[in-house]
Regions:
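Short beta->alpha junction loops/turns
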Residues: 14, 63, 90-91, 114, ...
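Accessory C-terminal segments flanking Radical SAM cores
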Residues: 223-337
Length: 366
């Protein structure tokens, strides 16, 4: 393969978050504020990413606005020549602070919504946040910011997909990202309640196709399918260590946000080492880069340079082996584990099952 080029840095600057979403993708073991990298460390990391040829800086969390230095990090990204994107719940944002973010050089903001209906959105997030998010969306439209609205869909709301799209239209988003839940982190515990049926997925594809035609030139729509119903796996993160680097709040550098679950891998700390040494020399980044690690059927598959064997974390979670072909692949000998998960989910009564929240919102009296 050609030399890997760092294209995007995903800076997970904190795990602190005011939401308690039932499909939270953050790792099960999160870092406390005491372990977070300092402002100076993040600024050095951002500069080093630019020197490696990086184009994009994605500031995320948790909720990145939980940190008081977000503006400084945005400015550091802009001064380094990076396109700066903020991925946020909107909580913690005021009109004043939004202006400060814009003044610092923010290019793009991605605002998450859990639903278009307030009661359901608040139920999923475990907190009363929906009404405030609507105000934040209005403030964003007052600025010359690229605006992406993110909506997560699952078994309980995908039947209202047309309503969700109209909701995004009313908020005047430039782009709508409709993402089916990906079953990592906390979402795995709620999989039986969240996983849609095959009929729901097929219906959603027809709705997306019609909406894309209708909204051409007005609002772009990106649709992320649920892995479990795909014929072939997605090229997770564009391939392991091929173009993206994620750095968690404590500085651990990884090829993806879930990679820490893979046993035997030691991830270097960007707070202590240079990004170049990590990107070019880290054993963890080299482990699944290229094709040498692949087993059959991946090794001889004509799609090996398209999907790169799929997701290593999903292979571990479902097949018990991070080197195995992603079990969502129709060619995988472990596909039976996905079929069993689908059968179990479809058999569940979604109305009677209780959500397992990331943090108990009742106990916190949110």
């Amino acid at each position: 393969m050609s030399a890997a080029v760092l294209k995007a840095l995903i800076a997970e600057i904190t795990h602190r978050c005011p939401l308690h979403c039932v499909y939270c993708s953050n790792p099960l073991e999160m870092h406390s504020v005491e372990n977070e990298l300092s402002t100076a460390q993040w600024m050095r990391i951002i500069q080093e990413a630019a020197e490696l040829g990086c184009w994009h800086l994605h500031l995320t969390g948790g909720e990145p606005l939980s940190r008081k230095d977000t503006e400084q990090l945005i400015r550091a990204g802009r001064e380094a020549g990076l396109y700066v994107n903020l991925i946020t719940s909107g909580l913690g944002l005021t009109q004043e602070r939004l202006q400060q973010l814009v003044d610092a050089g923010l290019d793009h903001i991605q605002l998450s919504f859990q639903d278009s209906e307030e009661a359901e959105a608040n139920t999923v997030s475990g907190t009363r946040a929906h009404a405030y998010k609507l105000r934040v969306a209005e403030w964003i439209r007052e600025h010359r910011l690229a605006f992406t609205l993110n909506l997560v869909v699952h078994r309980r709301n995908v039947d209202r997909l047309e309503q969700l799209i109209r909701f995004a239209e009313r908020l005047k988003a430039d782009k709508l990202e409709i993402a089916n839940v990906q079953y990592y982190g906390w979402a795995f515990q709620n999989r039986a309640k969240l996983l849609p049926t095959l009929e729901q997925v097929r219906a959603s594809l027809r709705i997306i196709e019609d909406a894309r035609k209708r909204l051409t030139g007005t609002m772009r729509i990106e649709y992320v399918l649920p892995d479990y119903y795909a014929k072939y796996p997605k090229p997770c993160m564009g391939g392991w260590g091929r173009g993206l680097m994620l750095i968690d709040p404590a500085g651990r550098a990884m090829p993806c946000h879930a990679a820490a679950v893979i046993p035997g891998l030691e991830f270097p700390n960007a707070g202590e080492l240079s990004l170049r040494s990590i990107w070019e020399g880290s054993a963890a980044f080299q482990r699944f880069r290229g094709e040498a690690w692949m087993q059959e059927p991946c090794r001889s598959c004509e799609r090996r340079e398209i999907d790169f064997g799929g997701c290593r974390c999903q292979a571990l979670m479902l097949a018990g082996d991070a080197v195995a072909t992603d079990p969502v692949c129709s060619l995988s000998p472990s596909r039976k584990f996905v079929e069993e998960a689908i059968e179990m989910a479809v058999a569940h009564d979604t109305k009677s099952q209780v959500w397992v929240y990331r943090i108990d919102p009742v106990a916190l009296k949110t």
